[in-house]
């Protein structure tokens, strides 16, 4: 192993081995948070056989600090009383940080795969760990990502509250319940005195409450506001697509109107991915001030044409969704296959969300991805 402070050189390929853990899990310790979203490994695959040795995420640290390790998180859920193993998740930490902050580069640790960019310094980084209130970053890499690696994305924080948080809240409630019960008796007597005083002054609180309930009921029975776009008497270029078939406004897909697959055209802005697609479209001011405009007479109308060029980031998932919609009408069988694959991935993701993690191993994190590990047994894995 290189000495402390030397630069990493991958001139000689080191055979990947699995070693012994220094402990029997991190059951009672707080697991530091990774800066990045995790990778979910395809079941049956071995991370250390697939992971490139320079597989360091982009976006944090300088060139000397592009060194660290991937740390395994084993997962399972209970199905009819039986334990069912779920695909492993792997979290990245920089050298000198995370659950193995004291480990040296290439130390043999079960559940750890070491990686580094060529030329990185073989010494602990000063990057630290992610704060509990900070969101994890999307994974981006210079090279190709193995097909068995699924790069996870952030979801709603509402689902990230752990059982430990609930237990803490439960304790607080039980401690305050006794005080509340004693205070309730005092509050009742004060309320009765106030009501009696108001009645003497001619204020009938009971009638006021009835009127308030009546108004509330009227509001709840009122019709739901109609959000359907009003397109009558509007030019085609001023119409807004609602939920439903858009061909009645914009016509069938053709060489001059080549955006949208069958699902998007049939559902309009009710299509599942419409919000993500809309984010890839330039704003009105961008089109107005950043386009090349021409105009010519066309009978009793003026034909206006504009050309607008802009760039979308290649590594943004929304860009891929957007590109799939271009000329989709011309390749229906290919689009249908892509849609079936998306549905299959969506169903797989829903099943993963049903996973159960034991209370004793769940940490209190603010992000949907926590780095909690189940106990890792000290065995050599071939």
Swiss-Prot record:
Self-association and partners: Homooligomer. Both monomeric and oligomeric forms interact with RNA. Interacts with protein M. Interacts with NSP3; this interaction serves to tether the genome to the newly translated replicase-transcriptase complex at a very early stage of infection.
Physiological role: Packages the positive strand viral genome RNA into a helical ribonucleocapsid (RNP) and plays a fundamental role during virion assembly through its interactions with the viral genome and membrane protein M. Plays an important role in enhancing the efficiency of subgenomic viral RNA transcription as well as viral replication.
Keywords: ADP-ribosylation, Host Golgi apparatus, Phosphoprotein, Ribonucleoprotein, RNA-binding, Transcription, Transcription regulation, Viral nucleoprotein, Virion
One family name in Pfam for this protein: CoV_nucleocap
A molecular-function term among this protein's GO annotations: RNA binding
All residue ranges annotated as the CoV N NTD domain in the record: 31-153
Residues bearing PTM Phosphoserine: 156, 254, 256
Gene Ontology CC annotation, any one: host cell Golgi apparatus
Full protein name: Nucleoprotein
Region named RNA-binding: 33-159
Post-translational modification (record): ADP-ribosylated. The ADP-ribosylation is retained in the virion during infection.
Biased amino acid composition, Basic and acidic residues: 201-235, 334-354
Main subcellular location of this protein, as a coarse class: virion
Family to which the UniProt record says this protein belongs: Belongs to the alphacoronavirus nucleocapsid protein family.
Name of the gene encoding the protein in the UniProt record: N
């Amino acid at each position: 192993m290189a000495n402390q402070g030397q630069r990493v050189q991958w001139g000689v390929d080191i055979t990947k081995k699995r070693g012994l853990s220094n402990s029997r899990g991190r059951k009672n310790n707080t697991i530091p948070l990774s800066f990045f979203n995790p990778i979910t490994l395809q079941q049956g695959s071995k991370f250390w056989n697939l992971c490139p040795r320079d597989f360091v995420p982009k976006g944090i640290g300088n060139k000397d600090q592009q060194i660290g390790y991937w740390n395994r998180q084993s997962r399972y859920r209970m199905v009819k009383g039986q334990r069912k193993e779920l695909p492993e998740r792997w979290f990245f930490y920089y050298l000198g940080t995370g659950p193995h902050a004291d480990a040296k580069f290439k130390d043999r640790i079960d559940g750890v795969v070491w990686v580094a960019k060529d030329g990185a310094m073989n010494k602990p980084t000063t990057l630290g760990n992610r704060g509990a209130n900070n969101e994890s970053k999307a994974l981006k890499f210079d090279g190709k990502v193995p097909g068995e690696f699924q790069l996870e994305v952030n979801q709603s924080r509402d689902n990230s509250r752990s059982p430990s948080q609930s237990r803490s809240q439960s304790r607080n409630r039980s401690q305050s319940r006794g005080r509340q019960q004693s205070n309730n008796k005092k509050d009742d007597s004060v309320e009765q005195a106030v009501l009696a005083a108001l009645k003497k002054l001619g204020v009938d609180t009971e009638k006021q409450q009835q009127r308030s309930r009546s108004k509330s009921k009227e509001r709840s029975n009122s019709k739901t506001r109609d959000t359907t776009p009003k397109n009558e008497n509007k030019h085609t270029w001023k119409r807004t697509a609602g939920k439903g078939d858009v061909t009645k406004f914009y016509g069938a897909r053709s060489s001059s109107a080549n955006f949208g697959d069958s699902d998007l055209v049939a559902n309009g802005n009710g299509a599942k991915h419409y919000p993500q697609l809309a984010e890839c479209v330039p704003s009105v001011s961008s089109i107005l001030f950043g386009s090349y405009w021409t105009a010519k007479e066309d009978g009793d109308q003026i034909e206006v044409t504009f050309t607008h060029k802009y760039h979308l980031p290649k590594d943004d998932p929304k860009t891929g969704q957007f590109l799939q919609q271009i000329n989709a009408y011309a390749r229906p069988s290919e689009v249908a296959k892509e849609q079936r694959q998306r549905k299959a991935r969506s169903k797989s993701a829903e099943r993963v969300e049903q996973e159960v993690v034991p209370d004793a191993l769940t940490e209190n994190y603010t992000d949907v991805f926590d780095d909690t590990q189940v106990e890792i047994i000290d065995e050599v894995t071939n």
